[in-house]
Amino acid sequence: MSLTLAIVGRPNVGKSTLFNRLVGKRLALVDDQPGVTRDLREGQARLGDLRFTVIDTAGLETATDDSLQGRMRRLTERAVDMADICLFMIDARAGVTPNDEIFADILRRRSAHVILAANKAEGAAADAGVIEAYGLGLGEPIRLSAEHGEGLNELYAVLMPLADEMEQQAEEQAPETDVDLDPEDEDGEEVAAPHAITREKPLQVAVVGRPNAGKSTLINRILGEDRLLTGPEAGITRDAISLQIDWNDTPMRIFDTAGMRKKAKVQEKLEKLSVSDGLRAVKFAEVVVVLLDAAIPFEQQDLRIADLAEREGRAVVIAVNKWDVEENKQDKLRELKESFERLLPQLRGAPLVTVSAKTGRGLERLHDAILRAHEVWNRRIPTAALNRWLIGMLEQHPPPAPQGKRIKLRYMTQAKTRPPGFVVMCSHPDKMPESYSRYLVNGLRADFDMPGTPIRLTLRGQGDKNPYKGRRKKNAGALAKHLKSRG
């Protein structure tokens, strides 16, 4: 469950006590003095069979300046913006205060889902405060006692339908990946991918990169309008924003994510949460655009982001931004390509495009590179063609014979797309050196025109379950007939 719940409210209403009860650990400092929680704390909550992320926020303050209270308020507002659900707590014994009314109005405007909870509601002394809470216009309040664990069943009953709704939305947005193929579907020709891009199923693209690489500026340029906040301060986009657009008549859903910093430099808890939100955006994408700053490309964090996308099995496009201010473009481009080949060999051949988000130069190339990467990611190769290719690869470079035992590669087929996944039936799969697997993968890339996309190669022994058993007789003999015709 990827649900995120932010607990918000005035200082000292019991937010950290509830946080500790949901998380099951004393991660948040609890004190009777207002303002003890000065940053955001995140934990994995358990409530019945619900599992979700819970954020304990600093107490909402009315200050809007650069004082500590002002910074706490802004931090809390950002948490409200990125959370799926806000649990707004008041102190039932104190009743509704003017500040509660101010913050209820803020939440009505900033959050799609607000749950009102009247905490410290044990005993008759809290009855008047619970009744007052109705006047906030946020629906019926839940009576809670975070200290004694009362009212959690009622909280569960309110959360459960919202969690189900959000899980369904997440499933609808999640791309199909690791799609199993039916070997009976082929007819000897290269099979077109059935995953057409439509307005109902737009191409899902995540734009990721270090802070201030120009992600929001790039998307604003694609949109043709200022939809996202941009500025020179690193990390100005703190949450992942999803926008559905038609880019050159291609329906897309683009995720602009928080810049991903090195962990040691991520000091604000909110920014740490935003990094994990960016990582989630990678999982929801089909194509990941890794945006680099031309002045400082391929830093360690860039490499980690690209490697994460490859490990998640997503198509990758490298875009180098701020190309308009680069003076020696030819030398710089050669340098970039050499660095790419050396530092990211697992993405050999992936598109590398230079762009200027500021001027719009290079956006056509970026659009075409995204479509090309998506097409390769969906590629399917017929079994007969694969086995013709395998024979040639074996003749050119036979597999090794560890301890005198020759490894025999008998048969190959494609088992998955999105990304392409291939299975080789062979003897002694556990003895196959990694270098020979790389030889086969690199050959697949070169000979079947699959640059850059992740390729999964699985070796199976004869004792493993044969996924092709039971194929129709005419298909089972297709390879034999083909080989006979070659003789």
From Swiss-Prot:
Protein name: GTPase Der
InterPro entries from the UniProt entry: G_ENGA, GTP-bd, GTPase_Der, KH_dom-like, KH_dom-like_a/b, P-loop_NTPase, Small_GTP-bd
Composition bias, Acidic residues: 167-190
Composition-biased stretches (Basic residues): 468-487
Limits of the KH-like domain: 379-465
Highest rank taxon of the organism: Bacteria
Residues binding GTP 2, per UniProt: 209-216, 256-260, 321-324
Function: GTPase that plays an essential role in the late steps of ribosome biogenesis.
GO biological process: ribosome biogenesis
Family the entry assigns: Belongs to the TRAFAC class TrmE-Era-EngA-EngB-Septin-like GTPase superfamily. EngA (Der) GTPase family.
Region (Disordered): 167-191, 458-487
GO molecular function, one term: GTP binding
Keyword Transport: no
Keyword Cell inner membrane on entry: no
NCBIfam families named in the record: GTPase_EngA (TIGR03594), small_GTP (TIGR00231)
Description of how the protein assembles with itself and partners: Associates with the 50S ribosomal subunit.
Keywords, sorted A to Z: GTP-binding, Nucleotide-binding, Repeat, Ribosome biogenesis
Amino acids binding GTP 1: 9-16, 56-60, 119-122
Ranges of residues in domain EngA-type G: 3-167, 203-378
